[in-house]
């Protein structure tokens, strides 16, 4: 079988970049290289003063947030290495996944810096790093991830339709639920603080993480689109039922986390509004995957509308050009190259 006849999830380890089968994945890699940032660019000095202004409820929220961030990106990085890189059989896609792994490492470094800055007490830091074990609302989210993602870890090859379906569920959980729902929920709390003029350093770093995570999610959805074209028989009623159930579970797990963060409610942020927001996001993910929405909720947070549209596309353009790594030149994708 020639390289041009292989499908994206066919077993093997394709190494040949010429001719390119999936040039769009390569372009995503190039775009990611242009948007390089470092933790050292994030100034957290003003955040220290802001932390002293927060109420006990708000301080509790921040502690839970940074604990989740550190835990969540570690789960993401492990899945990249153990599952996605192994089974997405495209050198172009693996270039992007290599870049994504670097970005996830930067995110972990950012969250490590947040923990060291926001939690001066060493015991508080240790508890945050061990959040999966000692914070029930974060443990519930981790258990959700393991339920939907771990079944692929021991698969060496995607030989059967059932194997490939399991991989798709892993990928969709990774993109739509972890990066596309859990992190989007956490970002909403960050931008709620920013809308009140607080924690600008956290918001700045989150801007760049938001950008990265959105690109990661978009790449994963393009992988799903490609598999749908190559193997449409995988996308049957059963898969739709499984994905819909997965998103429903993700909303409930994230809402439990929201109850932990918000308690009885804070001015402008409560569990009712967060449920509406999460349901809106879940519907968006289902529609992007080609499935029917189930909630019909609208986004209640105006500060997230701004973030999702204007800032997501423009904030890199506003950064000093010295921080943006340009990639010059073009690549000819002609198969006769």
Where are the regions that the model predicts?
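Non-heme di-metal
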Residues: 1-337
């Amino acid at each position: 079988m020639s390289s041009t006849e292989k499908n994206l999830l066919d077993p093997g380890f394709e190494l040949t970049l010429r001719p390119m089968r999936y040039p769009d994945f390569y372009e995503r890699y190039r775009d990611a290289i242009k948007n390089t940032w470092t933790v050292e660019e994030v100034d957290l000095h003003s955040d220290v003063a802001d932390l002293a202004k927060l109420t006990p409820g708000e301080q509790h929220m921040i502690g839970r947030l940074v604990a989740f961030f550190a835990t969540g990106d570690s789960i993401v990085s492990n899945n990249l290495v153990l599952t996605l890189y192994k089974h997405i059989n495209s050198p172009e896609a693996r270039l992007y996944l290599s870049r994504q792994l670097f970005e996830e490492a930067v995110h972990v470094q950012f969250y490590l810096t947040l923990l060291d800055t926001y939690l001066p007490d060493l015991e508080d830091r240790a508890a945050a790093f061990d959040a999966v074990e000692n914070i029930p609302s974060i443990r519930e989210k981790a258990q959700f991830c393991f339920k939907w993602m771990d079944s692929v870890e021991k698969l060496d090859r995607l030989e059967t339709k059932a194997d490939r379906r399991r991989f798709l569920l892993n990928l969709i959980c990774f993109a739509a639920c972890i990066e596309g729902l859990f992190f989007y929920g956490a970002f909403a709390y960050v931008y709620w603080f920013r809308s009140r003029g607080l924690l600008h350093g956290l918001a700045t770093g989150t801007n760049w993480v938001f950008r990265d995570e959105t690109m990661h999610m978009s790449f994963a959805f393009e992988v799903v689109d490609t598999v749908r074209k190559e193997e449409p028989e995988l996308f049957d009623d059963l898969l739709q039922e499984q994905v819909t159930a997965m998103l429903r579970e993700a909303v409930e797990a994230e809402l439990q986390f929201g109850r932990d963060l918000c308690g009885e409610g804070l001015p402008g942020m409560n569990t009712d509004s967060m449920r509406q927001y999460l349901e809106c996001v879940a519907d968006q993910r289902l529609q992007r995957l080609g499935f029917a929405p189930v909630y019909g909720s609208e986004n209640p947070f105006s500060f997230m509308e701004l973030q999702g549209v204007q800032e997501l596309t423009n904030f890199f353009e506003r950064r000093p050009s010295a921080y943006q790594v340009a990639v010059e030149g073009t690549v000819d994708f002609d198969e006769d190259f």
